[in-house]
């Protein structure tokens, strides 16, 4: 039963917030009144459990209305969910997505272990990336007809979800602030050894597609291939073109999973604290309960190493500063599930249903304690 390996606790002082939409994102203080910032931690296939909690938060509850969130942020699998939330997806949209969601297709069967090992030795990653890309395309296309309309595109436009850029999202936010929300996701430019924040909160990413940013944020090292962007050292921006009409120095840079640096992109708020003077922070996090599993070979060892890194690895370098500066509300999912646990579609639907039902009944509840 699900009760054996999941519990949810929330460190929160519930606040009845009044949300006023803001179009100007360049003011000294990003938002003139207290706003809500909602982060979803990276955790591989553990994101299935997060969907169950989000389903609950879509309904009336004593904590927060998702439509009252101003910025959604996430890392790795959290970036996928954050993008959907930023695009204004409703509960029915995520339910539509869950209907065809199947994580068992992400990894090779154990019978293909020799081929998996060969791919790793020759290409540097364990798994073919087709199914991850298909998943991201699917979630970006859920409401594409509405998005086309809101962007004033022709009815017969071939504009797809994979074409949506950060600039498009900023345009949607300005025109329909009740529906679309700001986005903040992180990745790691391993070529420059830097944590990178891809966001609508500045102009550096206007030409980059949400599709590519998700792939960059969720590119588990040695599991999936890294993403590639070109870096212009003159403009200090990333681009798709390897050449320019000027003499700017352009380098091809590799991006890997944001969880290598931080499982939630809280550091962006610290680095830009003058722009976030009055915010409530909400963070959906995973705490993994250690469990024994036998190491049967190099592939199993790599999987365990990555699971350890993303489950117990580095958190925000300034978490103490965050707690001092902001009201921090933490939803902590305590799981024995691993980063690479795979679930078929029926299992996914059952997990999300059970979590939703248990949140609704109070069997899984949010404990209110003062944030420190």
From Swiss-Prot:
Residues 38-270 form the PNPLA domain. Keywords: Hydrolase, Lipid degradation, Lipid metabolism. A motif (GXSXG) lies at residues 74-78. GO terms for molecular function: hydrolase activity. Its EC number is 3.1.1.-. It comes from the Viruses. This is Uncharacterized protein L620. The keyword Lipoprotein does not apply. It is an enzyme of class 3 (hydrolase). The active site is at residues 76, 257. A motif (DGA/G) lies at residues 257-259. Probable lipid hydrolase. SUPFAM superfamilies: FabD/lysophospholipase-like. InterPro entries: Acyl_Trfase/lysoPLipase, NTE, PNPLA_dom. A motif (GXGXXG) lies at residues 42-47.
């Amino acid at each position: 039963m699900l009760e054996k390996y999941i519990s949810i606790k929330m460190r929160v002082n519930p606040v009845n917030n009044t949300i006023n939409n803001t179009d100007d994102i360049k003011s000294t203080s990003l938002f003139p009144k207290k706003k809500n910032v909602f982060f979803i931690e990276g955790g591989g296939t553990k994101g299935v459990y997060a969907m169950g909690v989000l389903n609950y938060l879509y309904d009336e509850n004593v904590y927060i209305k998702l439509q009252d969130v101003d910025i959604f942020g996430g890392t790795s699998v959290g970036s996928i969910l954050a993008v959907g939330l930023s695009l204004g997806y409703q509960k029915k949209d995520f339910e539509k997505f869950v209907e065809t969601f199947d994580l068992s297709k992400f990894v090779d069967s154990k019978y293909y272990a020799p081929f998996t090992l060969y791919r790793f030795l020759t290409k540097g990653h364990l798994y073919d990336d087709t199914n991850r890309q298909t998943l991201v395309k699917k979630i970006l296309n859920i409401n594409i007809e509405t998005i086309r309309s809101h962007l004033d595109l022709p009815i017969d436009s071939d504009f797809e979800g994979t074409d949506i850029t950060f600039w498009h999202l900023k345009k949607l936010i300005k025109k329909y602030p009740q529906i679309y929300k700001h986005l903040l996701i992180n990745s790691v430019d391993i070529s420059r050894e830097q944590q990178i924040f891809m966001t609508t909160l500045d102009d550096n990413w206007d030409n980059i597609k949400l599709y590519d940013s998700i792939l960059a944020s969720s590119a588990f090292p040695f599991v999936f291939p890294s993403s590639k962007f070109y870096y212009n050292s003159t403009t200090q921006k990333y681009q798709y073109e390897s050449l320019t009409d000027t003499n700017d120095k352009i380098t091809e840079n590799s991006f890997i999973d944001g969880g290598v640096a931080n499982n939630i992109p809280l550091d962006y708020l610290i680095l830009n604290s003058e722009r976030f003077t009055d915010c409530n922070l909400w963070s959906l996090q995973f705490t993994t309960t250690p469990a024994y599993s036998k190491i049967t070979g190099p592939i199993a060892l790599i999987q365990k190493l990555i699971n350890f890194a993303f489950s117990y690895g580095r958190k925000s370098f300034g978490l103490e500063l965050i707690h001092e500066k902001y009201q921090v509300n933490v939803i902590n999912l305590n799981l024995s599930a691993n980063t690479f646990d795979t679930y078929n579609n029926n299992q996914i639907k059952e997990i999300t249903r059970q979590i939703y039902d248990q949140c609704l009944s109070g069997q899984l509840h949010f404990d209110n304690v003062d944030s420190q």
